[in-house]
Each structure stands twice: as C-alpha cells, then as structure tokens.
C-alpha cells in the first residue's frame, strides 16, 4: 500500500482524506479501550487484595465499641487529683476551734468575765485602739485595708469579735496550760504567717488571757 504521506505539491483526493480520518479515529478508540481495560484490571486487583487483607484482620484498625473503655480525659484526671489535695490552712484553724470548749469551771468563769469586759468596759476600748494602731502601722494587705476603711463602730465590733474567737480557741480544754497554748499556736502558725491581721489579734488575745492560763 502506498504511504499515507504525500508530497505537498500533490493534492490529496477527498475520499483518501476520509479514509485516513476514519483510520485515525479507529486507532484512538482502540487505544482508549486498552487504557480503560488496563485501569479496570488494576482496580479489580486492588479491591481483591484489600478484601483478602480485611478478611485476615491485618490492615483495618478496630474502633472502640460502646462497652470499651476510652482513655481518661485530662479534665477527669484534674478533677480526681483535686479530690486528694491537702486541706487548706483555714480548715486547720476550724479544726483547732472545734476541739471543745473550756471545761475547767474556774478558767471558764475567768474567760467569760474577760470577754464580757471586752464588750462592755474600758478594756474593750483600749483593746480596739491598740489593734487599730498595730494594723495601721503594719504592711498593707487586703485584709488590713478592709478593716481600716470600715466605719469606726463597725470596725470596733469586728475587732472585738475576732479577739473573742481567738480567746475561745486558745483557752479551752479540761485545764489549759502553757504547753497546750504552744501546741495550738503551732497548729495555726502557717495560717497566721499568711494572715498578719489575724496574727496581731491573736497576740493581743493571748496577752489578755495569759493570766488565766497561769492560774
């Protein structure tokens, strides 16, 4: 058969152009069919391999079922950790206060007499003036600032109540002795180191009650 390529000066008949065009289309169709056939074969092989590996249980990771335990969340860990924290210092102070009231009749009478003088007599006025000056002279803290900004009558009442609290904390038990006071002071010492106002009030309370312990 003659070559399909002719010199440029020879004009190609129209019927030959149609034959060449049809042959080109046929070759393109055959090439496209082979490509589709090869692609289908490869896809089938991949699907078959995946199916075999799935049956063997070796490739697809399993997801946790409803009954299966999930990893502990960080928030849950933090919540569980907070349950085991050490008790706060203020809790230690409350524990000291809850150990019992004064049981010795003589000391109890002296204690109640002292507290009554604080609320009704000149001893109370002298006490609140001393506390006010000591709190005013100390390094400023939120608690000291709060007390200094109170109205005078309210401040005096608050200071007397705080003093009574410390008196009842320090002077109690079957018969309070100096060693008992020392033990109670050691228990609340960390709290007093953070609360300087309370430390000042406790010191003044002890100064007023020392004669009761020494009886």
UniProtKB/Swiss-Prot annotation:
Ranges of biased composition (kind: Basic and acidic residues): 25-35
Region (Disordered) location: 12-34
GO biological process: one example: symbiont-mediated suppression of host JAK-STAT cascade via inhibition of STAT1 activity
This protein's record includes keyword Ion transport: no
Keywords: Host cytoplasm, Host-virus interaction, Inhibition of host innate immune response by virus, Inhibition of host interferon signaling pathway by virus, Inhibition of host STAT1 by virus, Inhibition of host STAT2 by virus, Interferon antiviral system evasion, Viral immunoevasion
PTM comment text: Protein Y1 is produced not only by alternative initiation, but also by proteolytic cleavage of C'. Only alternative initiation is detected in vitro, whereas in vivo cleavage seems to be predominant.
Residue ranges with Polar residues bias: 36-66
Note, other: The C protein is found in virion at a ratio of approximately 40 molecules per virion, presumably associated with the nucleocapsid. The P/V/C gene has two overlapping open reading frames. One encodes the P/V/W proteins and the other the C/Y proteins.
Domain notes: The disordered region at the N-terminus is involved in C protein self-degradation in trans. This self-degradation of C protein may play a role in the regulation of viral RNA synthesis. The disordered region at the N-terminus is also involved in the host STAT1 degradation in order to counteract the host innate antiviral response.
Assigned protein family: Belongs to the respirovirus protein C family.
Primary role: The different products prevent the establishment of cellular antiviral state by blocking the interferon-alpha/beta (IFN-alpha/beta) and IFN-gamma signaling pathways. They inhibit IFN-alpha/beta induced tyrosine phosphorylation of STAT1 and STAT2. Blocking the IFN-alpha/beta pathway requires binding to STAT1 in the cytoplasm. They inhibit IFN-gamma induced serine phosphorylation of STAT1. Block the IFN-gamma pathway by binding to and stabilizing the parallel form of the STAT1 dimer, further inducing high-molecular-weight complex formation and inhibition of transcription by IFN-gamma.
Quaternary structure and interacting proteins, as annotated: The different isoforms interact (via C-terminus) with unphosphorylated and phosphorylated human STAT1 (via N-terminus), favoring the formation of parallel STAT1 homodimers. The different isoforms do not interact with host STAT2. C protein interacts with L protein; this interaction has an inhibitory effect on viral transcription and replication.
Record-given protein name: Protein C'
Species of origin: Sendai virus (strain Hamamatsu)
UniProt lineage: Viruses, Riboviria, Orthornavirae, Negarnaviricota, Haploviricotina
């Amino acid at each position: 058969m003659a070559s399909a390529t002719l010199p440029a000066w020879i004009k190609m008949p129209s019927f030959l152009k149609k034959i060449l065009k049809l042959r080109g289309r046929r070759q393109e169709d055959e090439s496209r069919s082979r490509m589709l056939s090869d692609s289908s074969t490869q896809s089938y092989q991949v699907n078959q391999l995946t199916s075999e590996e799935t049956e063997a249980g070796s490739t697809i990771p399993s997801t946790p079922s409803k009954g299966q335990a999930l990893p502990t969340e960080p928030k849950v860990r933090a919540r569980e950790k907070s349950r085991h924290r050490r008790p706060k210092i203020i809790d230690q102070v409350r524990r000291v206060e809850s150990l019992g009231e004064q049981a010795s009749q003589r000391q109890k009478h002296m204690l109640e007499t002292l507290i009554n003088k604080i609320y009704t007599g000149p001893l109370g006025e002298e006490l609140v003036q001393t506390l006010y000056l000591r709190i005013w002279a100390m390094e400023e803290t939120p608690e000291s600032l709060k007390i200094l900004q109170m109205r005078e009558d309210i401040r005096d009442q608050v200071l007397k109540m705080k003093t009574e609290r410390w008196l009842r904390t320090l002077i109690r038990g079957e018969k309070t002795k100096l060693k008992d006071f020392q033990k109670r002071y050691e228990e609340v010492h960390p709290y007093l180191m953070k609360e300087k106002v309370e430390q000042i009030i406790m010191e003044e309370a002890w100064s007023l009650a020392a004669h009761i312990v020494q009886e």
